[in-house]
Amino acid sequence: MMRKLFNALSQLHRGVLICGGFAAFMLFGALLLMLPISQTGTKEVSFLDALFMSVSIVSVTGMSMFDLKTDFTIFGQLVVLFLMQVGGLGIMTMMAMVGISRGRKIRLQERLLIRDSFNLQTPSGMVMLVRKIILMTLSIEFCAGTILAAYFFTQNGWIGIYQGYWHAVSAFTNCGMDIMGNDVGFAGMAANPLVSTVVCISMLLGGVGFIALDDLLKHHRWSALTLNSKFILVMEMILIPLGVIVYFLLEGNNPATLGHLSTAEKWQSAFFMSISSRMAGFTLFDIHAMNNATGLIIMLFMFIGAAPVSTAGGIRTTTIGLLLLSLWSWIRGRKDVVIFHKRVDPECLVKASNVFTLATVLTFLTAMMVFLLEPASHFDFEDALFEAVSAFSTVGFSMGLTTEWNIPCKIVIMVAMFIGRIGVMTLAVTFAGRPKSQIKYPKENIIIG
């Protein structure tokens, strides 16, 4: 029976298996959150709300209509911790880890699944990659958790140790949820330079990606790094300061956000929000209180996201970087895109263009559906677009509309978060048919522009 089931599953497209694996685990998470032992009983949790929570957590988005501190028990919070840990690492990575720990040989089909889940080119070295990912994850979370636990212990006693490690996982997986309660939130924690720095580093390490981290650990010299790692690091060096400047200039005089802080605290908070806006979605203030100009720019940051093979989402920093360099090369009349004296494969540029186009279309479709499906909508299209970008990019920022959506809107946002987690490349490959012929037709140009 099991052999027949395995043979049937092996015939499915690997993209279908990846999507199915995430969907099944999200459903499993919803059932765990529905258990009476998971809830405090302060607020009714319907199955749809539990499923929304599970999808949000496993996709490491972090959108929630509940207060994890008051609405869920310690067991429920541990369920959330488990879901975001698996969601951050990926279903296929966790399954491979279980197989490796039991001494079982990882089959070629499983190696291909891991490769496809990370959008890598070759299945070679997948077992070693999984081991490194697990080791890096546990090491970073343990170090960050120990520092946070020591701080929270001085503030909250023994429960502070639990809070420290819980938030370390939330930061590294870029889920961006907290268990401090809506009355305190993360704003109170991030006001402390120690907590802010540790959480920022955790978010950044999770957002840089496992491939780049492994490359940095193996090679300590810039010249020895791969082109991929160099490009990822350069994009971070550009985007982080850019985000800091945006927040400081546009929100520095806004009393509802950063205006009430000292100059040093403004810079610190701007740095924190610059990283969080593309990765975890931790927030230090009410997002709805931001200036309109800031909201538009933050939507762009969320859409860009973090690096490939990371715990964060978005279209990826490499995608937007390649598109901008391709545009610059075209303006200068150059056929090839050259980065650090290396010519980029044209196939990479095609993939980047396709990812950007598909992601843009899906995001706007999501925003339109949310806006149209809410009959008594008291928000404008810009708010709907902000929520759609946040869901698709798995950042989790919200204009405060999460608790007010009707059932169709919740389903639309869940689909957006799901697609954002598996990635548009996986989605496209899953539904794309196999090429049926290699016939080359005559070439002719079409007028553009």
Language model features: what each stretch is:
Residues M1-G449:
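Membrane-proximal intracellular helices of multi-pass ion channels
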